[in-house]
Amino acid sequence: LGPFGPRFTAAKLLAEALPALSNAERRRRSIELLESVGLGEAHLSRKPVTLSGGQRQRVAIARALAAEPEVLVCDEAVSALDVTVQAQVLDLLEHLRVTTGVAMIFISHDIGVVQHIADRVLVMKDGRVVESGDVDAVLGSPTHPYTRALLAAVPTIPGETLASTAPVVSDAGRN
């Protein structure tokens, strides 16, 4: 359940992020936020324990968007989700990036996810950047031994490349 208290509804979680608004404005804005992440008004009354992992992640994204940030930090935002839900959340984040203009810093240990979502990549080892650049350049022709070791550690099916094992983006129904 992460940062969500089990007693709070999605409405309460979103309302906490909108303290300057009246109750009516908070409700209206909460519905807008939920709709922006593929959920709806019916989810306002739901508690985290009744939501799927993907739905909880969408509520968390809606809550973060309530502040209308210029930059959204996504720290392992899809690591606890199954692959199909990962693809849906990644699609959602890409859609939000395009429609709202929010920049994203996406932190992940999953090379396939990084390859799918990122334009640029920083590879860190022991808290220091060891390689950075265009994601295709860094992952396609790594220059640092640590980056090469990370890429070599990615499990693959014989005959498949890293690109072919990245999450599949689909138009499947939202979770």
Label the predicted regions.
Residues 47-51, 55:
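Conserved ABC ATPase signature
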Residues 25-42, 151-152:
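Conserved ABC ATPase "signature" region
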Residues 129-133:
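ABC ATPase "signature
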Residues 134-175:
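Short catalytic/signature loops enriched in Gly
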Residues 68:
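Conserved catalytic motifs of ABC-family nucleotide-binding domains
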Residues 6-19:
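Q-loop/switch helix immediately C-terminal to the Walker
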Residues 114-116:
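A short, surface-exposed alpha-helical micro-motif characterized by mixed small hydrophobic
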